[in-house]
Amino acid sequence: MTTIQHSGNDVIISFAGHLDTATSVEANLKISRELEKMVSIDSLTCDAMKLEYISSSGLRILLSLAKRHKDFRVINVQPQVYEVLETTGFTKIMTVERAMRRLSVEGCKLIGIGSVGKVYRLDGDTIIKVFREGTTMENVRREITLSKEAFVLGMPTAISFDIVKVVPSNQDEEERYGLIYELLKATTLGAYLKQHPEQIDECARKYADLFKQMHEIEVPEGGNIPSAVQHERQQIEHIRRYFPEESISMMLCILDSIPAGNQLLHLDLQTKNVMVQDGQLMLIDMGEVGYGHPLLDLGHSYSSMVSLIGDYEKTIGIPRELGQRFWNQAIEYYFEGLPAETIEERKKQIEVVSCIRNFSWLALSDSFPETVIEECKTMFDERVAQRFDYIKEVCKTFSNWTL
């Protein structure tokens, strides 16, 4: 059976059962009649979720559609049909997406929280990152693309081997996307520090080295990695609903003072979204990666590890005192070898830049509780408005931080 739907100029053709000699003639006629009625077609998608079998006559229908429509894809392909498409080479000449497995994380241990979702341990070999509600497939693909680019540039980044749908634990929730990673005996950096507090110094050095490794990588032009400053500006614009124009202007003033740069930045490097595997640090959350000046990256991490607003241990995974001590040791290692006065100046610069992230993170969701929003407004007055003369003076020194 073949059904055809369209929304505007976007067409979805759904196949069910068998697409073979007995059914393909009727299916092809139906498709042709419906498509001829349309003035223009922007995209054409074939949904194969219920397609059980495809023969050469069915393949000819797909090939004909692919030749006539530039934006063409076949989605939700079941294993037995995908095998046919792969064997015949169709997966190389058109976009073909497998049907996603559906998994539940009920009963799975929560091991990490990042800017875009939560990480659970599925079993001894694999973990799953579950994206927050509202994340689109386009967002998921973007993160996979950024992860691959960061990996190619030299970052220790885990690459997902499967996209799945995560079944909600109750009826009020929607299905979410998840990424599966194979990480043997891996745990979060936060959990590792709680289990091995005596290794805080060693971990702080590795954390600092991870930052330095990233910040030595220059992002080439023309890739998919976006400008971190432009992304930050968009987030500030997104929170205008919560803050008056004067407050927005203060945040933009800090942002506009940050020097230009093309270094690779993670922008959410904190202890609950970095994994430890065989003593090495591994990144799995690349949803905010961008390029720019390291000052912005370190400011983001300071806002999490030192000046986080809200429940610190729930978000970061360790007590605030341990997290701040860890950060202080790590930043000393990051600046190791620089004159003491330079280090002191850069620490002040990082603290000032963190004042942006302390509030721009509200752009990550449209459903934060009113109590959280009010706490942020109160803290803005304390951390930014009342100190703005001092902040402006520190901003004048940003240009001293040359790359």
Model-derived regions, located:
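Short beta-strand/loop segment at the start of cytosolic alpha/beta domains
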Residues: 1-14
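Catalytic activation segment of kinase domains across protein kinase-like and atypical kinase folds
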Residues: 274-298
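Conserved N-terminal boundary motif of the eukaryotic protein kinase catalytic domain
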Residues: 102-110
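ATP/Mg2+ or Mg2+-diphosphate-binding catalytic cores
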Residues: 341, 357-403
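An alpha-helical support segment within catalytic cores of ATP-dependent transferases
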Residues: 165, 216-267, 271, 277, ...
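ATP-binding pocket architecture of kinase catalytic cores
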Residues: 109-222, 259
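Active-site activation/catalytic loop segments of kinase-like enzymes and analogous catalytic loops
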Residues: 298-338, 354-371
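Amphipathic alpha-helical interaction surfaces in cytosolic regulatory modules
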Residues: 18-94
